[in-house]
Amino acid sequence: AVREMASAIQHTPLPLTGRLVKFALFRTQDDQYYIFGLGHHISVDGLGMALVSRRIATIYSALVAGEEIPPAYFGSLRDLVELETGYAASGDFQDDQTYWSQHLPPESGLDQRRREAAAGHDAYTPSASVQLDPAVVGHIKELSKNLRIRRYSVSTAATALLARAWSGSSSEVALDFPVSRRVVAESKTLPAMLAGVVPLVLDAPPELTVGEFCRNLDARLRELLQHQRFPVHTLEGGVGGRQASNRVAVNFIPSRLTLEFGGAQATASYTNHGPVGHFGLFFMGAGDELLLSTAGAGEPFASFEVADLAERLQRIIVAMAADPDRPLSSLDLLLEDEHARVDGWSNRAALNEPAVA
């Protein structure tokens, strides 16, 4: 019942003329409570809500102990405005703008004709979480060590290859990569909206090996994270009408936040992952535990159960780890009937037609 009530609150629009943050307290047992908080995405991001949660726990603990409430360490709205205007007038902003102007993806990605939403899906409600096989997590660690890349680069590579298989294009793939714009110390105490999304554009010619693709992806991620503060959406909305609505997003979310309320331990977790333009895959956990959740209404992925997508990604990861020297063209990422569907969407038959003089 608590989840249903929280979901109802979550699906009730917050008017921009009213409060953009809301809280509710549910008592489920004599000694068990749930605190539910949500904020309009223009006002606070996930890290901002974590700051608020820690502050609530601090105030509660002080009241229970009969102690003075510690002063807040939050920055103010003025601090946020000054931080953003200062960045906009800086050389860093100009460098970041130049970089992203040269690294926007072309008007490609998933086929434009497949942007329609799957019936019964919305862009916010996440799926259930499915745990990846610990043996597969071991393969991720192994490949990460052998190639000297970060672990999340392996998961991102598998996601990119799956998205590429459905795109009808064999030479390039573009993903949305959510990032935090909190790159300076002052921004890390602001309970505000400082999240962003940057495009991750990857060359994936068929002859490239798995290892080369993974290393290139890791290098590309390191490069773009040097420019993660820039609001890339301001360029994508105004340069050539580029749209991101048909790109798959891949996001990595930290494990649950542990809080203490007057000696009582509490665990905080996200009930959704924010707005999703097309479709998103969310990897959660730490160590040997890795969970996958999805959200979004974009096809074809919204028609798959999360367990199916997890199984597909696991097969890709196992194949990648087994032979990093194999070419990308040797990876069979689709089922037999799915190849025919992609051929139809991408108009592959046109390649066999005689050229028009």
Regions found by a protein language model. Name each.
Residues 1, 5, 17-19, 54, ...:
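Short amphipathic alpha-helices and their capping loops
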Residues 1-37, 44, 102, 106-109, ...:
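Acyl-thioester-dependent condensation/acyltransferase catalytic cores
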Residues 2-4, 49-50, 79, 93-98, ...:
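AMP-binding/adenylate-forming domain of the ANL superfamily
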Residues 24-78, 163, 302-322:
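Active-site-proximal acidic secondary-structure segment that organizes catalysis
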Residues 31-32, 85-97, 143-156, 166-269, ...:
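His-Asp-centered acyl/peptidyl-transfer active-site segments
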Residues 50-56, 152, 171-178, 205-212, ...:
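Extended, hydrophobic beta-loop-alpha segments that form or line the acyl/peptidyl-thioester binding
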Residues 222-224, 253-262, 300-357:
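Flexible, non-catalytic linker and terminal segments flanking ANL/adenylate-forming cores
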